[in-house]
A protein has these predicted regions:
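A ligand-binding cleft/hinge motif common to bilobed small-molecule-binding domains
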Residues: 85, 101-110, 158-161, 179-215
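Flexible hinge/capping segments at coil-to-helix
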Residues: 128-145
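A structural signal for short loop-to-beta-strand junctions that line the ligand-binding cleft
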Residues: 27, 57-61, 108-120, 207-212, ...
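Ligand-binding clefts/hinges and TM-proximal coupling segments of bilobed small-molecule sensing domains
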Residues: 25, 154-169, 209-210, 238-256
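Extracytoplasmic small-molecule ligand-binding "clamshell" domains
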Residues: 24-101, 109
Length: 256
């Protein structure tokens, strides 16, 4: 009887040790390795923008992640990714979290999110020479209107939900929907009010008249779904930095 009890105890201890090893938080890995790995697309100005000449990044996200790494006492490594594989990179452990991404039900099925620290409105844009053609959502949701979007993005799902009768053109990253519209290969694209303002300053595009954003879209970091230790750390860090005015100052720096 005593031998049976000893055997059971040993088995439970072995299982507990194995569970503890497999359940080690990304936080421990980051602190042990001295590196915070961040997945970023480098194509969402002014959130994250990659300079192909230097392979360096700049933007709102980049400042946030650099600050997070600094407070962790580690270096930051930006790992290139694209929108269609952004979530997969977190799930596969290629990086510890992502830069800013919209919170969606589809993404929540397989990944976790930090608390939101900024929100955006998603609205349609067209070129200035076509501005008079569009007035309201119904003017876009037609078979003779080509709406461009990027594969695997939350924008793709929104386009399909909002404009089911339109001719939807899906392009793969690094191509972007707005590029198709500027090149004359599509009529309308959707993007955040943040990126839209940047594009309006650089290209002959304009917001479609009389279309209100359905609602604000919360933005957060995508994180490993089961790693509550890491999620708790980041959420508390976000709350702390909000109190210090860091997020507000960073928004002002990038004109958000």
């Amino acid at each position: 009887m005593k031998l049976w009890k000893i055997g059971i105890t040993a088995a439970l201890l072995s299982l507990g040790a194995a569970f503890g090893a497999s359940a080690q938080s990304a936080l421990n890995e980051i602190l042990d390795s001295g590196t915070l790995k961040v997945g970023t697309t480098g194509d969402w100005n002014p959130m994250t923008l990659k300079d192909p000449a230097t392979n360096s990044y700049k933007g709102y996200d980049i400042d946030i992640m650099t600050e997070l790494a600094k407070d962790l006492g580690v270096e930051v490594e930006f790992v290139p990714t694209d929108w269609k594989t952004l979530v997969n990179g977190v799930v596969a452990g290629k990086y510890h979290l992502t830069g800013s991404a919209s919170i969606s039900a589809a993404r929540m099925k397989v990944a976790g999110f930090s608390d939101s620290y900024i929100a955006v409105e998603i609205v349609p844009f067209t070129t200035k020479d076509k501005a008079d053609r569009f007035d309201g959502t119904d003017s876009i949701n037609k078979a003779d209107v080509k709406v461009a979007t990027t594969l695997g993005t939350s924008f793709e799902k929104m386009v399909r939900d909002w404009y089911p009768d339109a001719d939807i053109k899906v392009v793969e990253a690094p191509a972007r929907g707005f590029q198709e519209v500027i090149a004359g290969r599509a009529d309308v694209f959707i993007t955040s009010n943040i990126e839209g303002s940047t594009l309006e300053a650089k290209f002959p595009v304009t917001r479609v008249k009389n279309v209100e954003a359905p609602s604000s879209t919360p933005i957060a970091m995508i994180m490993p779904q089961a790693d509550q230790v890491w999620i708790n750390y980041v959420n508390n860090w976000i709350e702390l930095k909000k109190g210090e005015g860091f997020f507000e100052a960073t928004r002002e720096k990038w004109g958000l």
